[in-house]
Amino acid sequence: MKQRGGFLGGQLLIAMPGMNDKRFIRSVIYICAHSDAGAMGIILNQLHHIGFPELLLHLGVINSGQKKDLSEPIKKFPVRYGGPVDPSRGFVLHSDDYACEETVLVADKICFTATIDILKAISCEKGPQHALIALGYAGWKAGQLEAEISTNGWLISSTSPSFLFESDLNRKYDESLIRMGINPTYLVSEMGHA
């Protein structure tokens, strides 16, 4: 297993109310990698229109006859819209009880894998105990994320595996603010600098 993450790796980005890019309004993003070359993360609180069985069919992991054999939890497994970059590519954030050669340890107990094998394992209920599947990712070139943070585009917060994998998708934005001690109704879109 590889280890990566960087300064912001394993942290949450929470969009400020003044976020100008409509793709990221009220977004909560888990940063998987951050370095001088840029950053990449997965949006946690946006569902993708494609379901997990359809994704498995599209990737050739199963055929149409095998779709009916999937368990109910697997049929209902949500797929997230991970971001606008590489939107047809799958990414899995997961607990550290699953690893292959391509798995990257992002933070304590949180890994990242982008292979067909992990999707096969999840579909057979032999994958990690906790997983979040996304299509696409959010990416920033060198210095771009830092510039957005300095102009109050994002809040930065720590997270936990339970928040990442178990909290309600529709409440993730408000919950992430509350965990920071911020009442979402009082958060304003404009901030000053001292």
Curated annotation (Swiss-Prot):
> Which protein are we looking at?
UPF0301 protein BH04450
Q: What HAMAP family does the entry give?
A: UPF0301 (MF_00758)
Q: Name one Pfam family in it.
A: DUF179
Q: Cite the PANTHER family for this sequence.
A: UNCHARACTERIZED PROTEIN YQGE, UPF0301 PROTEIN YQGE
InterPro entries, alphabetically? AlgH-like
Q: What is the lineage of its organism?
A: Bacteria, Pseudomonadati, Pseudomonadota, Alphaproteobacteria, Hyphomicrobiales
Mind telling me which GO cellular component terms the entry cites?
A: cytosol
Which family does the entry's similarity section mention? Answer: Belongs to the UPF0301 (AlgH) family.
